[in-house]
Every structure is written in structure tokens, then in C-alpha cells.
């Protein structure tokens, strides 16, 4: 399907707007994946707050110019599916990692987070980032454990003091 100039400009404008507000981006090759499976992936992406789009590589290079995702330019070769995480930096990486596990033809090429390229072999770094709620829960449990430990040490010191006296 040939796109005229106005269509191309509209695509670049739409995806650029999403890229400006995105926390991370993941690039994948979806050759050989059935339409049904891709529909499932897109549905899961919408539920996870991930914007997915297949865009021509030349247009994607224009989209990422001047953004933290400019480092991904070299990965725009062949069929490219790009996903932008809008709510949580690891959402798209987690989604693609799980999908690639079930679909051998789906290949994650690379990801970008804060201007740094993350190779496909290291995608776990991004996928295992805790969500905001998980991070708060971990912090609260660490603070709770620290105060409980401090109480135990104080009681032990008091006990030792009384035994020594």
C-alpha cells in the first residue's frame, strides 16, 4: 500500500507524540507470527499501557530523531514492530519477553531506556524492573524490617546490660 506525503506526515506526527511521552521502547521482528497471535499481543499491550505500531523504517528514523530513543536507529532493519511503554518502563519488555517465549518466530531486537540501548540478550534487565507499586512495597518492607531489627538489637542490648549489672 503506497502512502502519500500527508499520510506519512500523519504517521510520523502520531508516533512522535507517543515517543515524546514514553518511558522506554522495545523493537522486535514479528515475521512469521500469525495474525491471531499478533492480535492477542496488541490486546495485551493495550491493557498494559503499551503503544505498538508497525512503521516503515525510514519513518521510524524520523520519529526517533531528537528523542532518547535515537540510539535505536541501527535496529530499524527489516520488518519492525516498535512498542513504547507509557506507564511503566519495563511493561513493553515484559510483554515482548513473555510473547517471545511462546512464539519462536517473534524476535526481540533491542530496547532503549533513558537513552541507552539494551541488547536483546540483556532485555531481562528492563523486563524485571519493579512497577511503582512493587518498588514502594519493597521500600516499606525494608523500612519495616529495619525498625524491627533495631528494636531487637535495642532489647538485646538492654538484656545484656541488666545481666552485666
Swiss-Prot record:
An annotated GO cellular component: large ribosomal subunit
Q: Which Gene3D superfamilies match?
A: 3.30.70.1730, 6.10.250.2350
Write down the CDD domains for this protein, in alphabetical order.
Ribosomal_L10
Keywords linked to the UniProt accession:
Ribonucleoprotein, Ribosomal protein, RNA-binding, rRNA-binding
Per the record, the GO terms for biological process are: translation
| Pfam family name, one | Ribosomal_L10
Provide the GO MF annotations for this entry: large ribosomal subunit rRNA binding; structural constituent of ribosome
Domain of life of the source: Bacteria
What's the stated role of this polypeptide?
A: Forms part of the ribosomal stalk, playing a central role in the interaction of the ribosome with GTP-bound translation factors.
What family does the Swiss-Prot or TrEMBL record give for this protein?
Belongs to the universal ribosomal protein uL10 family.
Q: Tell me the protein's name.
A: Large ribosomal subunit protein uL10
Amino acid at each position: 500500500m503506497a502512502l502519500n506525503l500527508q499520510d506519512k506526515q500523519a504517521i510520523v506526527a502520531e508516533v512522535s507524540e507517543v515517543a515524546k511521552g514514553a518511558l522506554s521502547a522495545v523493537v522486535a521482528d514479528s515475521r512469521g507470527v500469525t495474525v491471531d497471535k499478533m492480535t492477542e499481543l496488541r490486546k495485551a499491550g493495550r491493557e498494559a499501557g503499551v503503544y505498538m505500531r508497525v512503521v516503515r523504517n525510514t519513518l521510524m528514523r524520523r520519529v526517533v530523531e531528537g528523542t532518547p530513543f535515537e540510539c535505536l536507529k541501527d535496529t530499524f532493519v527489516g520488518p519492525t514492530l516498535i512498542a513504547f511503554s507509557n506507564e511503566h518502563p519495563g511493561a513493553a519488555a515484559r510483554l515482548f519477553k513473555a510473547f517471545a517465549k511462546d512464539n519462536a518466530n517473534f524476535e526481540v531486537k533491542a530496547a532503549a531506556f533513558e537513552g541507552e540501548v539494551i541488547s536483546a540478550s540483556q532485555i531481562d534487565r528492563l523486563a524485571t524492573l519493579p512497577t511503582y507499586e512493587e518498588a514502594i512495597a519493597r521500600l516499606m518492607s525494608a523500612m519495616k524490617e529495619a525498625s524491627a531489627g533495631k528494636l531487637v538489637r535495642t532489647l538485646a542490648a538492654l538484656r545484656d546490660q541488666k545481666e552485666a549489672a
